[in-house]
Amino acid sequence: MPRWAVFAGVTALVLILLLALARASQLTVDGSVSSAVGADSHQPTDHRSHDGSMDPGSNGGATESIESSTAQFDAPTRPGALSPGALLANVALSQGLFAIVLLAGAWYAEIPPAALGVSAAPLSTGPPALGVGIAMGLGLYLVNELGTLGANAAGIETPDALRELLTPDSRSGWLILLVGVLPTIAVFEELLFRAALIGALAAGFPISPWLLAALSSIAFALGHGAQGTVGMVATGGLGFVLAGTFVVTGSLLVVVVAHYLVNALEFVVHEGLGVEFALGD
């Protein structure tokens, strides 16, 4: 017989620890960015416009191509900045450990897999679920890009310091990021914020899954404090869309795939390929 209260306690513990770690990470990122800015102030300025091209008055004057941006794979770490490898290892280990704790709690409390969004239904674990997840991921990424463009056009800064700090400085680092770290993040965060906080609690207690979706999205935003206020608002909105998708489909796989694609595309497009979109003047 499922012990819902036990699993709810484990979930609450993991959430509290995650939020505490997120707060500590926010302070670390803020310090690292400040150090990096201080170091950059002593370096020659690379004048670039917001669309990624060189300003005509700067040395070089030519537009930066997508191919040339691959040089950043081997770019050295800036003085005072945390090592991308150390940051990636910290993220993977901490979130991987939290995922193991949640899964162990679900096993101990005898939580049925269906309550966590895992069943034999095609829309849960079959090819249809994979297809829906891919479509959702691509759609959310496009919406995110359009939102960023709109915010920038309105003069609202959209911070990307955390993404830059996590960007690998080698090809092997990119492989680890895309194959190891980002999948771990997607699996853990969807397991916690969608499967546990919505699926399991709605199955075990008389609580509306839509109310749980709203509350879990707030917690999801708070867990991304290192992205700044604007980033938290955007993440909260993304979290609610993923939560709604989980409620409608009942599939953990769908939201994991969508979550992974949003993160992976942001890294590959902006940091890997060096592409920056901008509205026409």
Q: How would you label these PLM feature ranges?
A:
Residues 101-102, 147, 198, 242:
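Generic structural marker for isolated residues within well-ordered, non-membrane alpha-helices
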Residues 107-185, 198, 203:
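Juxtamembrane helix-loop-helix connectors linking adjacent transmembrane helices
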Residues 2-10, 86-94, 127-136, 173-177, ...:
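Alpha-helical transmembrane segments of integral membrane proteins
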Residues 19-31, 144-149, 194-195, 199, ...:
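Short helix-terminus and kink motifs of transmembrane alpha helices
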Residues 49, 54-58, 114, 130, ...:
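Generic detector of intrinsically disordered, low-complexity, polar/charged segments
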Residues 14-16, 162-281:
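Transmembrane helix-loop-helix hairpins at the membrane interface
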Residues 1-131, 141, 267-281:
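N-terminal, membrane-interfacial amphipathic/helix-forming hydrophobic leader that caps
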Residues 75-78, 87-89, 156-158, 191-193, ...:
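N-terminal start-of-chain detector that recognizes signal peptides
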